[in-house]
UniProtKB/Swiss-Prot annotation:
Pfam families: RRF. Transmembrane segments: none annotated. It comes from the Bacteria. This is Ribosome-recycling factor. GO terms for molecular function: ribosomal large subunit binding. Responsible for the release of ribosomes from messenger RNA at the termination of protein biosynthesis. May increase the efficiency of translation by recycling ribosomes from one round of translation to another. It is found in: Cytoplasm. Keywords: Cytoplasm, Protein biosynthesis. It comes from Marinomonas sp. (strain MWYL1). GO terms for cellular component: cytosol. One of its GO terms (biological process) is cytoplasmic translational termination.
């Protein structure tokens, strides 16, 4: 019983951390990284398709991404999709290759991005605490139904707290890494 509750809580907490990671990927640093374009969708024969499924995305240098479409007729569509995305990027086409220079971040922009990252991290911590509350509630229900003893409940809550601390620490590590990335010039 307790192990099932712990396993469920741990699964949900790892998903919360993954969600924070994916939110962090959308926050642009000064460095070029293919995951910046993960949210870009291209009109591919009438359906919105992720850019990574219609083109190769490569890092040409520290501040430039290269996009090579698999079909030449997609070049204008990809350009349009990148311009439409709210990433603040301006693609430059050179034949079949689309180069995307990463604009340098101003100090103010860096601080705003870091604020956004802190908010995402806080949302992740809140989600983890809510999962802890749910798990502890499930343990209390088992005590009420006399399926586990008070001592088992206490041990279970301690285990839930350890798991919670582990995942909150993971979010903190990722936030620190993101801050380092953002504040690096």
């Amino acid at each position: 019983m307790i192990n099932e509750i712990l396993k469920d809580a741990e699964d949900r907490m790892s998903k919360a951390v993954a969600s924070v990671e994916s939110a962090f990927k959308k926050i642009r640093t000064g460095r070029a990284h293919p995951s910046i374009l993960d949210s870009v969708k291209v009109n591919y024969y009438g359906s919105e398709t992720p850019l990574s499924q219609v083109a190769n995305i490569t890092v040409e240098d520290a501040r430039t991404l290269g996009v090579s479409p698999w079909e030449n007729n997609l070049v204008p569509e990809i350009e349009k999709a990148i311009m439409k995305s709210d990433l603040g990027l301006n693609p430059a086409t050179n034949g079949n290759l689309i180069r995307i220079p990463m604009p340098a971040l101003t100090e103010e922009t860096r601080k705003n991005y870091f604020k956004q990252a802190k908010n995402e991290a806080e949302n992740g911590r809140i989600a983890i605490r809510n999962i802890r509350r749910d798990a502890n509630g499930s343990l209390k229900d088992l005590v009420k139904e006399k399926e586990i003893s008070e001592d088992d409940d206490r041990r279970g809550q301690d285990q839930v707290q350890k798991v919670t601390d582990k995942y909150v620490a993971q979010i903190e590590e990722r936030l620190a890494a993101k801050e380092k990335d953002l504040m690096e010039i």
